[in-house]
């Protein structure tokens, strides 16, 4: 499993394109969530223009392939920190936190 911390680089986003690019970004992570690539997706509440994704991808290469499809990946508009981890314990009540 991998956790991905994404931070957008405001200075790299072309002027007047922010809203359009964000809509494409939403479509990208929604598509990957709906097909099961992402297990969790959400924005940080304590950091602007940043969020987290958890994926059950088997390899770092598979994660990189997914990330390369993100509109922000091109031209270095975002920074992606990819960390491998093992989910040793998962609370049965985890789903109750959706949207909080």
Where are these regions (language model features)?
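Conserved, structured core segments of small domains
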Residues: 1-100
